[in-house]
């Protein structure tokens, strides 16, 4: 055993070898020594437990190769790019939508340079970081002012904490939503220090229910867009317009959590209709909050629009600093919003709309091409077909609506073969994520961004 221990090289000797000098030059002295120590310690442990040297100690070149390999792994980012073929275009677990080229350019420019984030160049003095985008949002929505935070949940929390702490907020029982990650409206209210007052029933809420619940401790009336579920049948709800008229009688504000939010008429694009921010503002709602990384097609952020006096209150609350966005997100968001100044070009420039508005003919062609490539790579255990599919927008947007789509389906007699195929897809340089349904593995091409890159990867695999 002592003889084996003597074969373990000293770290200082490894450092003086040409390979060691090269690795230190590339990765630094500290990182090289740390990795070498780990390997040497592993070698010692193996000698004690198994009375033999590990394979990498048989040749000195092997230990240098392993050190290099491990150091390279440390440089790799853990979040992998993937190909989304689930059929869910805005898949929350896969990062939702892609940014437009303009947004990417704006974000990259902000990363590489100083920007006038909170500085008025003309006046030569400090400014507010939301001001430039706020003016753009006002133009797009018709609102008096805007406030930007890091997501819509933060927007809801800020509104509640600013105006309802220690007070009551009235919400319809049918609108007490829970979204992914166990985000619940009642929990957010508790966190903000306000009391939830539920009115109506799960399926029916009347204007009188709100009226009967109003008292001297009421902070405001709240509407929550149930973006991830839909109640059908014997139902009744109260519109924003009705709530606004009621609130005026008691000098109370109305706030609306619009969730996914949309700044364009989806029906014009041939897609299912979704409530627009502009409509809520026009209805007289005092504050409207919505997400930026869902139907808007931008980075993760939350926007609150509404009456200037209320927005000023949000901007001055201590939580606003906690929840604010950085220069990169603000730059990408502004670039995304500027696309909406040219609505007829949205489907050409915003990836979310590019994917959602693809024709069936385009999808059929993509599916046939994908099938042809896969047929070359898969053996006779797998039967491939191009079939009609139903895709969805995702991220809690229009939960009951589906989009006609096309998919490549893979069938195998043995379920274990399909599981093996899924494992192979996940082991690719950029994993392919599909879905199981009807005893087949589905690869829905509507949600597949970077389609040519997908085919190239499969050709080379």
Curated annotation (Swiss-Prot):
Keywords: Cytoplasm, Protein biosynthesis, Pyridoxal phosphate, Selenium, Transferase. GO terms for cellular component: cytoplasm. GO terms for biological process: conversion of seryl-tRNAsec to selenocys-tRNAsec; selenocysteine incorporation. Pathway: Aminoacyl-tRNA biosynthesis; selenocysteinyl-tRNA(Sec) biosynthesis; selenocysteinyl-tRNA(Sec) from L-seryl-tRNA(Sec) (bacterial route): step 1/1. The modification N6-(pyridoxal phosphate)lysine is found at residue 294. Its EC number is 2.9.1.1. HAMAP family: SelA. This is L-seryl-tRNA(Sec) selenium transferase. The lineage of its organism: Bacteria, Pseudomonadati, Pseudomonadota, Gammaproteobacteria, Pasteurellales.
């Amino acid at each position: 055993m002592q003889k084996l221990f003597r074969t373990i090289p000293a770290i200082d000797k490894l450092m003086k070898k040409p390979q060691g000098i090269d690795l230190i030059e590339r990765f630094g002295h500290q990182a090289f020594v740390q990795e070498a120590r780990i390997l040497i310690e592993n070698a010692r442990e193996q000698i004690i437990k198994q009375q033999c040297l590990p394979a990498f100690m048989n040749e000195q070149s092997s230990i240098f190769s392993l050190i290099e390999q491990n150091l390279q792994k440390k440089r790799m980012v853990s979040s992998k790019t993937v190909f989304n073929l689930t059929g869910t275009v805005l898949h929350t677990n896969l990062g939702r939508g892609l940014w437009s080229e303009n947004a990417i350019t704006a974000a990259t420019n902000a990363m590489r340079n100083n920007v006038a984030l909170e500085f008025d160049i003309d006046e030569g003095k400090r400014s507010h970081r939301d001001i430039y985008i706020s003016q753009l949002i006002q133009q797009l929505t018709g609102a008096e002012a805007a406030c930007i935070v890091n997501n819509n949940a933060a927007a809801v929390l800020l509104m509640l904490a600013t105006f309802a702490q220690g007070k009551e907020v009235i919400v319809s029982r049918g609108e007490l939503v829970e979204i992914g990650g166990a985000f619940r409206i009642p929990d957010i209210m508790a966190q903000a220090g306000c009391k939830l007052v539920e009115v109506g029933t799960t399926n029916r809420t009347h204007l009188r229910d709100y009226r009967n619940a109003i008292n001297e401790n009421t902070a405001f009336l709240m509407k929550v867009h149930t973006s991830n579920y839909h109640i059908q049948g014997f139902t009744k709800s109260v519109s924003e317009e009705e709530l606004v008229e009621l609130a005026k009688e008691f000098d109370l504000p109305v706030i609306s959590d619009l969730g996914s939010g949309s700044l364009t008429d989806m029906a014009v694009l041939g897609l299912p209709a979704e409530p627009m921010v502009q409509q809520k503002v026009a209805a007289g709602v005092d504050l409207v909050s919505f997400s930026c990384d869902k139907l808007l097609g931008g980075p993760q952020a939350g926007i609150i629009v509404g009456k200037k006096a209320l927005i000023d209150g949000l901007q001055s609350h201590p939580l606003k600093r906690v929840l604010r966005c950085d220069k990169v997100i603000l730059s990408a968001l502004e670039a995304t919003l500027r696309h909406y100044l040219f609505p007829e070009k949205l489907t050409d420039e915003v990836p979310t709309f590019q994917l959602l508005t693809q024709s069936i003919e385009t999808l059929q062609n993509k599916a046939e091409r994908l099938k042809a490539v896969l047929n070359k790579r898969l053996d006779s255990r797998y039967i491939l077909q191009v079939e009609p599919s139903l895709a969805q927008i995702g991220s809690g947007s229009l939960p009951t609506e589906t989009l006609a789509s096309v998919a490549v389906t893979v069938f195998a007699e043995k379920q274990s073969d399909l599981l093996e195929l899924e494992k192979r897809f996940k082991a690719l340089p950029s994993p392919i994520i599909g879905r199981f349904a009807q005893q087949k593995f589905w690869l829905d091409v509507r949600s597949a961004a970077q389609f040519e890159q997908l085919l190239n990867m499969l050709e080379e695999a």
